[in-house]
């Protein structure tokens, strides 16, 4: 099977689902169809009812060109399921992109991933670098999936909306953490 379909697999902790819902919205803006995305917190992107999760995922990894997006956080590294996903993607030599969720730092990256690969830090204080890395990711996905380019003004608006959502979610999570202490 030479021309395998391109698919995105988002590996994240269920505790970080809000971030990933916003990220899927950004992917759809780029032109990725929801049937090309696996993200279990988004109804149109989740694993079909009645399927064995691990069998379904194994088939996806074998039958598709998978690009994994890791949503790294402390929650990620506390989840056996996400660490299993990381191992499976490593064994299959999948292309991957790392998102560092707010509050997570590069020094905490661990596991079988290449720690020298540049990731996107979603709370990077250098907003120019953050926007540049998101644009590079967009361009890579457009090329990889054979998508049409998005209007630059529309992209900037949707990207900024995404970054604002990330900020709001992070602030909400900070409040939840503070109030539970």
Which positions does each model-derived feature cover?
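C-terminal interaction surface of TIR/SEFIR-family domains
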Residues: 1-9, 17-25, 29, 103-181
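Short glycine-/polar-rich loops that comprise or flank the Walker A/P-loop
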Residues: 6, 33-35, 63-67, 92-97, ...
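Long, contiguous alpha-helical segments
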Residues: 9-11, 37
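Short hydrophobic segments within beta-strands
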Residues: 11-13, 99
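Short alpha-helical
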Residues: 15-18, 77
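Structural signal for conserved beta-strand scaffold positions within catalytic alpha/beta enzyme cores
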Residues: 39-41, 98, 120-121
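Conserved beta-strand-loop-alpha-helix hinge of the TIR/SEFIR fold
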Residues: 56-107
């Amino acid at each position: 099977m030479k021309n395998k379909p391109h698919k995105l697999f988002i590996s994240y902790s269920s505790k970080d689902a809000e971030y990933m819902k916003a990220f899927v919205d950004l992917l759809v803006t780029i032109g990725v169809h929801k049937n090309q995305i696996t993200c279990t917190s988004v109804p149109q992107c989740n694993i079909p009812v009645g399927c064995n999760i691990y069998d379904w995922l194994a088939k996806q990894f074998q039958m598709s060109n998978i690009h994994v997006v890791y949503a790294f956080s402390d929650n990620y590294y506390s989840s056996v399921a996400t660490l299993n996903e990381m191992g499976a993607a490593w064994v299959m030599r999948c292309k991957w992109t790392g998102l560092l969720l707010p509050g997570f730092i590069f020094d905490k990256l661990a596991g079988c991933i290449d720690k020298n690969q540049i990731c996107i830090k979603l709370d990077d204080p250098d907003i120019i670098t953050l926007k540049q890395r998101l644009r590079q990711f967009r361009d890579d996905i457009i090329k990889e999936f054979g998508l049409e380019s998005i209007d630059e003004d529309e992209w900037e608006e949707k990207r900024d909306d995404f970054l604002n959502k990330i900020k709001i979610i992070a602030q909400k999570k900070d409040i939840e953490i503070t109030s539970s202490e």
